Amino acid sequence: MIRIATWNMKQAVAPKKPLPELWKWIESEIDPDVIVLTEARVPKDGLPDGWNGIWTPGGIGPRRTWGTIIAAREIELEEAKFKRNPKRIKEYIHPHPATLHTADILIDGDTWATIVGAYGFMPDSKNGWDAALGIVNECVDLLDSGNERVILAGDFNLWPKDILPVVENNLELVDIMGLVDDLPELKGAVGGSRIWTHKNGNSPNAARQELDFIFTTEELADEVVAVAGGIDDFPNAWDVSDHAPVIVDFK
Protein backbone atom coordinates (compact mmCIF):
# COMPACT_ATOMS: atom_id res chain seq x y z
CA MET A 1 0.00 0.00 0.00
CA ILE A 2 1.14 3.56 -0.70
CA ARG A 3 -0.26 6.66 0.98
CA ILE A 4 -0.42 10.00 -0.85
CA ALA A 5 -1.34 13.15 1.07
CA THR A 6 -1.63 16.90 0.74
CA TRP A 7 -1.47 19.52 3.47
CA ASN A 8 -1.01 23.29 3.78
CA MET A 9 1.73 23.97 6.37
CA LYS A 10 0.66 27.61 6.92
CA GLN A 11 4.06 29.23 6.45
CA ALA A 12 2.78 32.21 4.45
CA VAL A 13 1.32 34.16 7.39
CA ALA A 14 1.68 33.68 11.16
CA PRO A 15 2.98 30.09 11.39
CA LYS A 16 1.57 28.28 14.42
CA LYS A 17 4.50 25.96 15.17
CA PRO A 18 8.26 25.74 14.47
CA LEU A 19 9.18 23.80 11.34
CA PRO A 20 10.71 20.80 13.15
CA GLU A 21 7.44 20.31 15.05
CA LEU A 22 5.42 20.48 11.85
CA TRP A 23 7.54 17.81 10.17
CA LYS A 24 7.17 15.58 13.22
CA TRP A 25 3.40 16.16 13.07
CA ILE A 26 3.41 15.06 9.44
CA GLU A 27 5.18 11.85 10.37
CA SER A 28 3.04 11.02 13.40
CA GLU A 29 -0.40 12.22 12.29
CA ILE A 30 -0.45 11.95 8.49
CA ASP A 31 2.14 9.19 8.05
CA PRO A 32 2.47 9.61 4.28
CA ASP A 33 4.72 7.88 1.80
CA VAL A 34 4.48 10.91 -0.49
CA ILE A 35 3.05 14.30 0.43
CA VAL A 36 2.38 17.58 -1.37
CA LEU A 37 2.99 20.44 1.05
CA THR A 38 1.75 23.91 0.21
CA GLU A 39 2.70 27.21 1.85
CA ALA A 40 5.64 25.10 2.98
CA ARG A 41 9.25 25.51 4.01
CA VAL A 42 12.17 23.14 4.43
CA PRO A 43 13.99 23.40 7.78
CA LYS A 44 17.22 25.41 7.73
CA ASP A 45 19.32 22.25 7.86
CA GLY A 46 17.37 20.60 5.04
CA LEU A 47 14.71 17.92 5.00
CA PRO A 48 14.49 15.75 8.13
CA ASP A 49 16.28 12.40 8.13
CA GLY A 50 14.64 9.84 5.90
CA TRP A 51 12.99 12.37 3.60
CA ASN A 52 13.78 13.38 0.03
CA GLY A 53 11.95 16.00 -1.95
CA ILE A 54 11.58 18.49 -4.76
CA TRP A 55 11.12 22.20 -4.10
CA THR A 56 12.44 25.63 -5.05
CA PRO A 57 15.09 26.85 -2.58
CA GLY A 58 14.12 30.27 -1.28
CA GLY A 59 10.48 29.80 -2.21
CA ILE A 60 8.61 32.32 -4.33
CA GLY A 61 10.93 35.21 -3.53
CA PRO A 62 12.53 37.33 -0.79
CA ARG A 63 9.19 38.34 0.71
CA ARG A 64 7.64 34.90 0.28
CA THR A 65 10.20 32.29 1.26
CA TRP A 66 7.69 29.44 1.05
CA GLY A 67 6.29 27.36 -1.79
CA THR A 68 5.16 23.88 -2.77
CA ILE A 69 7.20 20.86 -1.70
CA ILE A 70 6.77 17.28 -2.90
CA ALA A 71 8.38 15.07 -0.24
CA ALA A 72 8.67 11.32 0.27
CA ARG A 73 9.95 8.78 2.80
CA GLU A 74 11.58 5.50 1.75
CA ILE A 75 10.45 6.25 -1.79
CA GLU A 76 12.56 8.02 -4.38
CA LEU A 77 11.31 11.12 -6.18
CA GLU A 78 12.67 12.34 -9.48
CA GLU A 79 11.74 15.58 -11.22
CA ALA A 80 9.40 14.56 -14.03
CA LYS A 81 10.44 15.05 -17.63
CA PHE A 82 7.82 14.92 -20.35
CA LYS A 83 7.20 16.46 -23.73
CA ARG A 84 5.64 19.88 -23.38
CA ASN A 85 3.48 21.64 -25.93
CA PRO A 86 5.53 24.66 -27.07
CA LYS A 87 2.41 26.56 -28.10
CA ARG A 88 0.89 26.09 -24.68
CA ILE A 89 4.08 27.17 -22.89
CA LYS A 90 4.27 30.29 -25.04
CA GLU A 91 0.64 30.95 -24.27
CA TYR A 92 1.12 30.68 -20.50
CA ILE A 93 4.33 30.70 -18.50
CA HIS A 94 3.72 30.07 -14.81
CA PRO A 95 4.82 33.26 -13.01
CA HIS A 96 5.51 31.54 -9.69
CA PRO A 97 7.25 28.22 -10.40
CA ALA A 98 7.89 27.64 -6.68
CA THR A 99 4.18 26.91 -6.28
CA LEU A 100 4.03 24.11 -8.88
CA HIS A 101 6.23 21.00 -9.08
CA THR A 102 6.00 17.67 -10.87
CA ALA A 103 7.76 14.46 -9.79
CA ASP A 104 7.91 10.81 -10.74
CA ILE A 105 7.33 8.46 -7.80
CA LEU A 106 9.84 5.64 -8.12
CA ILE A 107 9.38 2.23 -6.51
CA ASP A 108 12.20 -0.27 -7.00
CA GLY A 109 13.54 1.97 -9.76
CA ASP A 110 10.30 2.01 -11.77
CA THR A 111 7.87 4.91 -12.08
CA TRP A 112 4.76 4.04 -10.10
CA ALA A 113 3.01 7.33 -10.91
CA THR A 114 3.67 11.00 -11.60
CA ILE A 115 2.48 13.58 -9.09
CA VAL A 116 1.79 17.27 -9.65
CA GLY A 117 1.92 19.38 -6.50
CA ALA A 118 0.07 22.65 -6.90
CA TYR A 119 -0.84 25.76 -4.94
CA GLY A 120 -3.46 28.25 -6.10
CA PHE A 121 -1.33 31.34 -5.53
CA MET A 122 -3.34 34.54 -5.03
CA PRO A 123 -1.14 37.59 -5.67
CA ASP A 124 -3.90 39.94 -6.80
CA SER A 125 -7.21 38.29 -6.05
CA LYS A 126 -9.17 36.52 -3.34
CA ASN A 127 -9.12 33.03 -4.81
CA GLY A 128 -7.01 30.67 -6.87
CA TRP A 129 -8.26 31.51 -10.36
CA ASP A 130 -4.99 33.30 -11.20
CA ALA A 131 -3.12 30.00 -10.91
CA ALA A 132 -5.75 27.63 -12.30
CA LEU A 133 -4.70 27.98 -15.95
CA GLY A 134 -1.07 27.18 -15.19
CA ILE A 135 -2.04 24.13 -13.16
CA VAL A 136 -4.32 22.82 -15.90
CA ASN A 137 -1.69 23.43 -18.59
CA GLU A 138 0.93 21.51 -16.62
CA CYS A 139 -1.41 18.53 -16.36
CA VAL A 140 -2.64 18.71 -19.96
CA ASP A 141 0.93 18.44 -21.23
CA LEU A 142 1.63 15.58 -18.83
CA LEU A 143 -1.49 13.67 -19.86
CA ASP A 144 -0.83 14.37 -23.54
CA SER A 145 2.52 12.63 -23.09
CA GLY A 146 0.62 9.35 -22.66
CA ASN A 147 1.02 9.02 -18.91
CA GLU A 148 -2.01 7.18 -17.51
CA ARG A 149 -0.89 7.26 -13.88
CA VAL A 150 -1.08 10.88 -12.76
CA ILE A 151 -1.96 12.45 -9.42
CA LEU A 152 -2.78 16.14 -8.96
CA ALA A 153 -2.79 17.35 -5.36
CA GLY A 154 -2.63 20.56 -3.39
CA ASP A 155 -4.42 23.61 -2.05
CA PHE A 156 -6.18 25.24 -4.99
CA ASN A 157 -7.79 28.12 -3.07
CA LEU A 158 -11.01 27.29 -4.90
CA TRP A 159 -14.18 25.66 -3.63
CA PRO A 160 -15.40 22.34 -5.06
CA LYS A 161 -18.07 24.03 -7.16
CA ASP A 162 -15.32 25.97 -8.95
CA ILE A 163 -12.35 23.59 -9.20
CA LEU A 164 -14.15 20.28 -9.83
CA PRO A 165 -15.61 21.30 -13.23
CA VAL A 166 -12.25 22.73 -14.32
CA VAL A 167 -10.34 19.54 -13.51
CA GLU A 168 -13.00 17.07 -14.62
CA ASN A 169 -13.82 18.82 -17.91
CA ASN A 170 -10.29 19.78 -18.97
CA LEU A 171 -8.27 16.90 -17.55
CA GLU A 172 -10.81 14.09 -17.01
CA LEU A 173 -9.26 13.35 -13.62
CA VAL A 174 -11.18 11.68 -10.81
CA ASP A 175 -11.84 13.56 -7.55
CA ILE A 176 -10.90 11.05 -4.86
CA MET A 177 -13.37 12.50 -2.35
CA GLY A 178 -16.08 11.74 -4.86
CA LEU A 179 -15.26 8.03 -4.41
CA VAL A 180 -16.52 8.15 -0.82
CA ASP A 181 -20.07 6.87 -0.41
CA ASP A 182 -22.58 8.67 1.83
CA LEU A 183 -20.47 11.61 2.97
CA PRO A 184 -22.43 13.36 5.74
CA GLU A 185 -23.62 16.89 5.06
CA LEU A 186 -21.08 19.50 6.16
CA LYS A 187 -23.16 22.09 8.00
CA GLY A 188 -22.13 25.71 7.52
CA ALA A 189 -20.15 24.78 4.40
CA VAL A 190 -19.66 27.08 1.42
CA GLY A 191 -19.06 26.44 -2.27
CA GLY A 192 -20.21 22.83 -2.22
CA SER A 193 -17.60 21.85 0.38
CA ARG A 194 -17.93 18.27 1.61
CA ILE A 195 -15.10 18.11 4.17
CA TRP A 196 -13.65 20.92 6.27
CA THR A 197 -10.02 21.39 5.21
CA HIS A 198 -9.62 25.16 5.77
CA LYS A 199 -10.59 27.13 8.85
CA ASN A 200 -11.49 30.58 7.58
CA GLY A 201 -10.98 32.66 10.73
CA ASN A 202 -11.45 31.92 14.42
CA SER A 203 -15.13 32.73 14.72
CA PRO A 204 -17.37 29.77 15.63
CA ASN A 205 -19.45 30.78 12.63
CA ALA A 206 -16.51 31.01 10.22
CA ALA A 207 -17.19 29.48 6.82
CA ARG A 208 -16.26 25.82 6.51
CA GLN A 209 -14.27 25.46 3.34
CA GLU A 210 -12.81 22.62 1.30
CA LEU A 211 -9.79 23.98 -0.59
CA ASP A 212 -7.45 20.96 -0.58
CA PHE A 213 -7.90 18.17 -3.12
CA ILE A 214 -6.38 15.05 -4.62
CA PHE A 215 -7.27 14.01 -8.18
CA THR A 216 -6.12 10.94 -10.11
CA THR A 217 -6.38 9.34 -13.51
CA GLU A 218 -8.95 6.56 -13.84
CA GLU A 219 -6.31 3.83 -13.77
CA LEU A 220 -5.13 4.96 -10.33
CA ALA A 221 -8.67 5.60 -9.10
CA ASP A 222 -9.34 1.88 -9.56
CA GLU A 223 -6.53 1.18 -7.04
CA VAL A 224 -7.87 3.40 -4.24
CA VAL A 225 -8.56 1.50 -1.02
CA ALA A 226 -9.15 4.33 1.48
CA VAL A 227 -9.78 8.08 1.53
CA ALA A 228 -9.74 10.47 4.48
CA GLY A 229 -9.45 14.17 5.10
CA GLY A 230 -10.61 17.27 6.91
CA ILE A 231 -10.84 18.13 10.57
CA ASP A 232 -13.10 15.17 11.39
CA ASP A 233 -10.30 12.77 10.44
CA PHE A 234 -7.49 14.96 11.81
CA PRO A 235 -9.05 16.55 14.93
CA ASN A 236 -5.89 18.31 16.14
CA ALA A 237 -5.02 19.88 12.77
CA TRP A 238 -6.12 23.36 13.89
CA ASP A 239 -3.41 23.23 16.57
CA VAL A 240 -0.69 23.33 13.92
CA SER A 241 -2.25 24.97 10.84
CA ASP A 242 -5.43 26.51 9.47
CA HIS A 243 -5.70 23.54 7.09
CA ALA A 244 -6.39 19.85 7.64
CA PRO A 245 -4.80 17.14 5.46
CA VAL A 246 -6.36 14.98 2.76
CA ILE A 247 -5.02 11.45 2.21
CA VAL A 248 -5.61 8.55 -0.15
CA ASP A 249 -4.29 5.00 0.15
CA PHE A 250 -3.62 2.92 -2.96
CA LYS A 251 -3.22 -0.85 -3.03
PLM-predicted stretches and their roles:
Residues I2-M9, W23-D45, I115, E138-L164, ...:
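Active-site beta-strand/loop signature of hydrolases that rely on acidic residues for catalysis
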Residues T6, R64-I69, P95-T102, R208-I214, ...:
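Short hydrophobic/aromatic beta-strand or adjacent loop that forms the aromatic wall/cage
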Residues T6-P18, D124-G128:
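Acidic/histidine-rich helix-loop elements
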Residues K10-A12, R41-P43, E76-L77, G120-P123, ...:
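Short, solvent-exposed loop/turn segments at secondary-structure junctions
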Residues V34-G120:
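Structured beta-strand-rich core segments of catalytic domains in phosphoester-bond hydrolases
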Residues G58-P62, E91-I93, L152, N202-A206, ...:
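Short Gly/Pro-enriched turn/cap motifs at secondary-structure boundaries
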Residues K81, S145-N147, L158-K251:
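Metal-dependent phosphoester-hydrolase catalytic domains
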Residues G120-I135, P160-E172:
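Active-site-proximal segments of metal-dependent phosphoesterases and phosphodiesterases across multiple
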